[in-house]
């Protein structure tokens, strides 16, 4: 007699039960949940004397910026006119506001009121800029005019805040000279490379360090180099808050690396350069303790939303500076296409309950994503239109000029506006990017702090945001609440609002502790139940068949 299981109907039932068991036992990836932010005040880093975590050496030549035809350095920068800085000086010039610039250092210049704040690269004083980035950023914030405009009278007449604390002592001797290769790729905005567990294999070239000033666009004409103005000739470099004081803290550099550098990943040729998120955290605490009332961070780390690394120390440092020490923290949003940075979706029409589209974030920008404590800045062009390469994200608060940038050279001290080609056949690269947009907003924050010293840092940010020129939707992920308006921020009747952020409500993607082993009890119960049911069905079918066979 043929086996009952040889009947087609019973074979199908058995196969169906087997497939059900296999499907239930397969490991289907779970959906990624984005946890809400949390700040643990106990994790605020100690304010030790600035210095590197490990021995460092210079590995590249210093960058030497140049002057190109456009923008014309003999005229005021287009961004200066776009946001009407000269009129804002009628109400405030940032008198007495200490502005910390956490960047590549600032080279001293008679037109820049700068004090040393320390150096996390070589343990020096922070008054050295090998990357020609921090000096340009500081020029936008506080450079004194030369020739085209007169130096405005200090407003308010009395300095709003005490001068910053004295410089930190030097903790290490300068590094001995080392043989260096030919000129490095040009810098701004410096991107921090953080060593984290690698995410799933990225597309080719993802995560590689692109030129921080943005790759040249092959569709645009090359801007030819031109001779700079002679020393002492009038130029268009003018800071937003010329009576503010810059505190220079060198935290990042592409010209230095550890003496014993390590790769980012086991299969990566990318090396960890000078500057990490932890050193940003320490620099923020140090700047706040020196008395900075505005902290400009024009360095950006971009990380995948699925693997943002452990940033609890940075979050605690930002919380401390913003709430305990009352500092306005301004950060660059990042530039699309650079070192892992990419645009996030703008809006999900299927989810109107999430107008900033946090749930579709794919790449996060740090420290910008700590939006309870940081004012993140996107970039517009010389006409006020959003810059395509300005990284979008729900943390963007406002926008400011990010093209046609000029500043003071860290070498000769004169006006510069571009980097030379890093390789034969490449183009000159005019300064552009959200690094410089952040500098404009830091200058505006200094103006507001000087005029309204009674406002808290959070209230200053509120005034800047409330007075911005909104985009068509009121707010979006490219421009935030729109282009800053310094005159409106200084003159409009704007309610002060809450003294502090309502809590850690920003949707910062922070890594949780390592997850516990998967709990498969529910799955195992389901498998057992289905197996029992399937076994029962088969047994009943076989029993019925046997009874009929008798």
Give a label for each model feature.
Residues 1-35, 527-545:
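Secretory targeting and sorting signals
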Residues 39-40, 44-274, 289:
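Active-site core segment of subtilase-fold serine proteases
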Residues 51, 62-72, 284-307, 332-333:
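Short acidic, glycine-rich surface-loop motifs adjacent to enzyme active sites
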Residues 103, 334, 433:
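Active-site glycine-centered loops adjacent to acidic/histidine catalytic or metal-binding residues
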Residues 122-128, 268-274, 302-308, 385, ...:
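Second-shell loop/turn segments in exported
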Residues 175, 181-189, 452-548:
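C-terminal subdomain of the subtilisin-like protease fold in secreted/lumenal serine endopeptidases
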Residues 193-196, 293-410:
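Catalytic-core segments of hydrolase enzymes
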Residues 402-479:
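Hydrolase catalytic cores
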């Amino acid at each position: 007699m043929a086996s009952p299981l040889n009947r087609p109907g019973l074979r199908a039932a058995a196969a169906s039960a087997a497939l059900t068991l296999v499907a239930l036992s397969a490991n289907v990836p779970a959906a990624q949940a984005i946890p809400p932010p949390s700040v643990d005040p106990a994790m605020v880093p100690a304010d030790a004397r600035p210095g590197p975590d490990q021995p460092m050496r210079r590995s590249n030549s210093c960058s030497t910026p140049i002057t190109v035809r456009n923008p014309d350095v003999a005229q005021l920068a287009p961004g200066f006119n776009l946001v009407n800085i000269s009129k804002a000086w009628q109400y405030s010039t940032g008198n007495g506001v200490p502005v910390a610039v956490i960047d590549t250092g600032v080279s001293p210049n008679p037109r820049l009121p700068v004090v040393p704040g320390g150096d996390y690269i070589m343990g020096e004083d922070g008054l050295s800029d090998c990357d020609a980035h921090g000096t340009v950023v500081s020029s936008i914030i506080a450079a004194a005019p030369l020739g085209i405009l007169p130096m405005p009278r200090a407003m308010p007449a009395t300095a709003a805040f005490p001068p910053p604390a004295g410089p930190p002592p030097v903790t290490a001797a300068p590094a001995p000279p080392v043989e260096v290769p030919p000129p490095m790729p040009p810098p701004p905005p410096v991107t921090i490379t953080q060593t984290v567990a690698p995410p799933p294999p990225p597309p080719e070239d993802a995560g590689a360090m692109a030129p921080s000033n943005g790759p040249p666009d092959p569709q645009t004409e090359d801007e030819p180099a031109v001779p700079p103005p002679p020393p002492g000739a009038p130029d268009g470099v003018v800071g937003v808050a010329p009576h503010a004081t810059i505190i220079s803290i060198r935290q990042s550099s592409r010209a230095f690396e550890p003496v014993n550098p390590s790769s980012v990943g086991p299969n990566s040729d990318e090396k960890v350069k000078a500057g990490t998120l932890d050193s940003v955290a320490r620099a923020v605490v140090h700047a706040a303790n020196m008395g900075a009332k505005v902290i400009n961070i024009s360095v950006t780390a971009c990380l995948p939303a699925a693997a943002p690394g452990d940033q609890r120390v940075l979050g605690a440092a930002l919380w401390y500076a913003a709430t305990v020490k009352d500092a306005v923290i301004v950060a660059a949003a990042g530039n699309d296409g650079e070192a892992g940075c990419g645009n996030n979706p703008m809006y999900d029409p299927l989810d109107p309950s999430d107008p900033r589209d946090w749930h579709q974030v794919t790449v996060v920008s740090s420290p910008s994503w700590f939006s309870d404590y940081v004012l993140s800045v996107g970039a517009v062009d010389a006409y006020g239109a959003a810059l395509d390469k300005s990284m979008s994200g729900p943390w963007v608060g406002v926008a400011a000029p990010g093209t046609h940038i000029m500043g003071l050279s860290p070498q000769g001290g004169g006006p510069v506006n571009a980097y030379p080609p890093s390789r034969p056949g490449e183009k000159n690269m005019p300064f552009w990017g959200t690094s410089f947009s952040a500098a404009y907003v830091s200058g505006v924050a200094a103006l507001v702090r000087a005029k309204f010293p009674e406002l808290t840092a959070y209230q200053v940010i509120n005034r800047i945001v409330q007075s911005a020129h909104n985009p068509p939707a009121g707010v979006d992920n490219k421009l935030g609440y729109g282009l800053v308006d310094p005159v409106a921020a200084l003159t409009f009747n704007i309610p002060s609002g809450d003294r502090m952020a309502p809590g850690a409500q920003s949707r910062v993607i922070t890594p949780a502790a390592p997850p516990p082993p998967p709990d498969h009890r529910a799955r195992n119960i389901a498998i057992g139940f289905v197996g029992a049911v399937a076994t029962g069905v088969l047994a009943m079918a076989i029993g019925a068949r046997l009874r009929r066979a008798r």
